[in-house]
Every structure is written in structure tokens, then in C-alpha cells.
Amino acid sequence: MANVFEVLERDHQEVKRLMDELEERPRGGADEQERMRQRKNQVRQLIIEESKHEAVEEEYFWPAVRDLVPQGKELAEHAIKQEQQAKYVLNDLIDYEPGVARFEEMLGDFINDAREHIAYEEEQVWPELRLVISPERAMELGTKIQKAKRLAPTRPHPHTPPRPGLLKAAGPFVGAADRIRDLVAARTRH
Ligand SMILES: [Fe+2]
Ligand SMILES: [Fe+2]
């Protein structure tokens, strides 16, 4: 059992860990091809984690912020704009190969923006929500988010409007289709 802040923080930690790994200087030894294969896997993992996380925030977190926080509408709008932009970049990243200049440039931009987005949520939004949310509702929201993550889409879907309700209606199907595509992509790469 964990409340909404604990659940989201765990996700943020995981995303930050993956981004730190991607920024590490390559260690000597491993051959270039192997290194690029690893990098591709790390990016794939980042896309999966980030897609699931933002999808469940859209479905459950932002509606709660809008509902409970006095300036919630504005806070949510700003954050969702950042999330949408990130989805377009991630969607493009799927088609590029690591090592290619364009890929590395897009990834670098994504990482900067993602850190900014995470800081915005943790520093601007969470403190406001903490002031007004009851412990019961925080737990309930955490549980819902954890459950929804199991079926959430693992790809960014930038063309789907970031509205709550869509995930409830289409999420399990989109999530399942994404997982099949992830598997196929993983197999063809070996
Ligand atoms: Fe977010
Ligand atoms: Fe987040």
C-alpha cells in the first residue's frame, strides 16, 4: 500500500535512473555494436516506463489536481503540455538508431525536458496537492494508479488526446497491442 506521492515518486526515481544511465560516458572494453544494442534497450525501457507513467497521470492524477487544488487547472495544463511534447519526441525516438547524431540530440533534449517536468510536478504541484488531499484519498489514488499501470500503454501515443476516460475505455487494448509490438521489436533485434 502506498499513497499517490509514493507511487509517483517511485516512477520518477526509475525514469531518472534510466536517464542517468543513458548519460553515462561509455566505458571502454565493450564493442561498439554491443554498446549500441544496450543503449537501444535502455531507451526502449525508458519509453515504456515514461509512457505508462504519463498515461496513468493523465487518467487519475491530473483530474485529482484539477478537482482539489485551487490553481489546479493551470498547473495541470502546463504539465500536460510538457507531457504531450515529450510523447512526440519519444515517438520519433522509436524509429531512430542510437549513435546517429539526430537520435542523440533528441534523446539529450528529451532528458533535459523530462527532468524539468519531474521537478515541476514534485516542486510545484505535489506541495499544493499535499495541502488539500486527505490521507484516504491519497491512498485510494495511489492504489488506482498502481493498478492502472499494469495495463497502461507502453508506447507514447502522441496523437491520442491527453484526456481522462480514454485510458479507461481504450487503455487495456492499446496497452496489450503495445506489449505485442514491444515483444516483436525485441525479437527482431536479436
Ligand atoms: Fe508527468
Ligand atoms: Fe510524473
Q: Model-found features: residue ranges?
A:
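Small-residue-biased structural context
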Residues: 1-190
